[in-house]
Amino acid sequence: MATSKLPAVSGEEETTILMAKEELEALRTAFESGDIPQAASRLRELLASSDCTRLEVGVTGESGAGKSSLINALRGLGAEDPDAALTGVVETTIEPSPYPHPQFPDVTLWDLPGAGSPGCSADKYLKQVDFGRYDFFLLVSPRRCGAVETRLASEILRQGKKFYFVRTKVDEDLAATRMQRPSGFSEGAVLHEIREHCVERLRGAGVHDPRVFLVSNLSPARYDFPLLMSTWERDLPAHRRHAGLLSLPDISLEALQEKKDMLQEQVLKTALVSGVIQALPVPGLAAAYDDALLIRSLRGYHRSFGLDDDSLAKLAEQVGKQAGDLRSVIRSPLANEVSPETVLRLYSQSSDGAMRVARAFEKGIPVFGTLVAGGISFGTVYTMLQGCLNEMAEDAQRVRIKALEEEEDTQPDVSLEAAGDNGVEKRGSGEGSMEEAPLSTRRKLGLLLKYILDSWKKRDLAEDK
């Protein structure tokens, strides 16, 4: 991923623009050739390729490993949701079954039949599921890595592809160990033992650096599930990162920030397209194209951050709240709908800083000088989309803070001590006396997210001044 530093303008911080190296070179060639229509066409291709990049993920393992439940968890669905993968106590998958992401159908998780069934050789299984068609694999096992898993791992390596070993049902292992050895039980020690065994077995199968994740499909916020998602996104090749990241459920602040960083690339590309279209001598083209382009971009941001009605309803159901309660903390003017009238109003409000932004780009990336010499459309679109992206990202954080809040009437005044890591909250009880009580996980996350959001708002205010 190439980066371009834009110089600070009027006291502003430098802006880092992320763009794949091949994309930057293609843009450079188009602009240096002086062929503006070709540049416009190339930019539209880049935007289109980001919107329709496909990611095929094969989820494999023996029967009963929890593959279907893992797919549902990765897609942010429960077992009873309409589009959920079929789960059961017996094998329910008899042929490869595709499950597109609910919001992003170009990301597909394939539920593969159970491997290691009697009468089905390894070679026959690989042919049956068309093993070579998938970009990436999740190798799932409910037990300590055995012969079936090591055979599949070897085949994935032979194809030059990557996989993560996902050890499911660790909550059941912990419960069983706690029952068998209550006096000497240590959750950390049990998880360490399971992990080390899996790593050792995979290394014995030729895996140089095994990636092992211990998860419970029923508790996607616990154990290694958040780490699984962030590691998966980070390791995807550049041409797959966009689709992979947008498919991940936002269960952490880090996931939201990574999603915002990825959408930041689209802001620059969209502004460049708008600037090029403005330079074309075709009456009426610029206005018509800009309206459609901006509406499509803003609706994409809205959906990506889970601010649409379907996503809010699903989150509300998961946390036992009303969707209206979550919607009440959304402040963006785009909360209700992205209409041409709303876009026009935001566009006019963003024109003040247009030339300043355009000059920064012209100075930072001289090859774009032809485009930004006029600067009005490019700078206005960039300023508008950047502002909307920031607002929607903050709305997404506020929604998740609200989702994690305890009911107000059951919570006394609470303060989270910045220097402490002992997980306690201070509760007032009488005059001056303080009583320590365990800080619930939901309350801790809610307070932490609120603290970070307030810090970001203070930083933004300082930058505005």
Swiss-Prot record:
The keyword Protein biosynthesis does not apply. Residues 53-235 form the IRG-type G domain. Keywords: Cell projection, Cilium, Flagellum, GTP-binding, Hydrolase, Lipid droplet, Nucleotide-binding, Phosphoprotein. GTP binds at residues 62-69, 87-91, 169-171, 216-218. Its EC number is 3.6.5.-. One of its GO terms (cellular component) is membrane. Belongs to the TRAFAC class dynamin-like GTPase superfamily. IRG family. This is Interferon-inducible GTPase 5. It comes from Bos taurus. The lineage of its organism: Eukaryota, Metazoa, Chordata, Craniata, Vertebrata. The gene is IRGC.
